[in-house]
Every structure is written in C-alpha cells, then in structure tokens.
Amino acid sequence: MNVTINGNELNVEVLGPEGAPVLIAHHGGGGIGSLGEPKATFGPLADELRVVVFDARGCGRSEGKPPFSHAQWAADVDGLREWLGAEQVMVAGGSYGGFIAMEYAIAYPDRVRAMILRDTSPDNSNLERAYENARNQDRIEINWDNFNRYWQGQIRDNEDLKARWQEIIPLYSHDYDPATALSQAAERADRGLYRYEAHNWCFQHNMPSFDLKPQLPGVRCPTLVTVGRTDWITPVSSAETIAALIPDARLVIFEKSGHSPQTEERDKFQAVMREFIHEVLGRTTA
C-alpha cells in the first residue's frame, strides 16, 4: 500500500495481527535496497509481532522527495509509528538500515522498545576497512575507478548503479564458488530496484560525517547486535564497538556468514531473534 509520511508516499507492507507489539524494519542499501530484504528477515516474526516493512524515501517503489538524509529517514520511521498508532516500537535494520535504526533510537529514545541490528557500523570507519579488505581479497579483480565511484556517490544513472553493485556482490558472502559466483551475482542484481539519486546522497552527504559513537552510550533500549564472521564491509570490529557502547546490548557472531547471516545461517538467525524478542516482551510485561 502507499502511505503518505511526512509529505512523501512510501510503499509499505504490514504483516501480523493488529494489537501485537510493533516492529518497524528498515532495509539496507540506500538506493539499492527495498522492503523485500527486511520482509524475508522479519516477516516470519509476524506470527507474534506486527511487522512493518517499507521502501525508504527515494528507494524501491517509494516517492523520492529529498532530502535522503539520516535525519529524514529516521523521521519517516517515526511517521510510520504515528500512522500505526503505536506508542513504542521495536526498530530493526541491517547494513545501512542499521544506521537508520541507531539514528532513530538516538533521536526518539522514548519511542523505542528494543532494537535489532545486523551487520552494521557505528561510524564511517568501516569504509576504510572495506577498502583494505577489497585490496586483500582474491575473489574478483577490482576495477578501482568503478569501485571508487560507487563508494563516493558518483553513480551516473540507475543502470550504472546496478552494474557497479553487481561487480562487488561476490565479496559479500561467506562461501564462494568461482564457478557460480558471477551468475549468482547477475541473478541477484536483476532482482534489485535501483535509485541512484538516493545512493549518491548517502555517500556524498551522509557518510562523510557519520559517527554515532558519542551518542550510543545514551541508548537505553535492549539491543541485539548480530554480524557475520567474514563480513567484509561492516566487519566484526564494527559490531563489537556498537555492542560495547550500548549499555544493554548483546553481540552474536555468526561463524559461517559474511554480510548476510539472516540468509546464510537463517535458522540460527531466526532463533536468536526470537529468543531476544521473547526476553524483551517478558521484561516489558513483567
């Protein structure tokens, strides 16, 4: 359904029973992400929760009125909360969506019941480590002009964004088979919805000053921090920093995953989430 939030139409799906605790999940990849990713990850929780997934402003099938800033995306999450009539919500996000989940918990502390983070970073230092990891890997030959344009927000159009994303997909998984990696990357890229304006905004305007470390000790909600052991772009060290800074956080490392433990170790990931949610709900209602 289309819902107007803060003057911008968002493509929204609501799963689960009315009256259940609400979880709002933000997708990753500003400009390359859409609601399909959090729907697959958090949708199974709709037997217990009211799960809300959506295409962020400027992403997927949503309208694209700028700015595509972290503050605006967090405000849109709160607009969804108001639209749902929920006093408090659980907020979740993976990768870039984790940035927005943390921004929301910082800006709207009284509205957050709990937070689930997956393979994300508290600041922009993960990009430096990603460059180092890219230089030291042997899966793909890096075209550094394309690589730099992607991570510096210099993408020309949606087709350029799709092509540049497809080139680096093989870096994201724990397991790698050179016989199938390129075809799998092409299939994954073909499933995407591309909005280069939002992508460029992320890396031209948002990331250069992104640093939540000073604010994270003030996050009061219980937080689950998850990460894949071989994540090249938001590595274990980033997750460890988040878990160390948020007072009521616990860290779970998935040993057989890269950037996507929610798919690479799906059963374990679902079990870890449910255990956390049951603890939160029990704590809240005790």
Which role does the model predict for each range below?
Residues I5-G64:
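Conserved HGGG/HGGXW glycine-rich cap/lid loop of the alpha/beta-hydrolase fold
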Residues G43, V52-Y96, A271:
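Active-site loop/oxyanion-hole signature of alpha/beta-hydrolase fold enzymes
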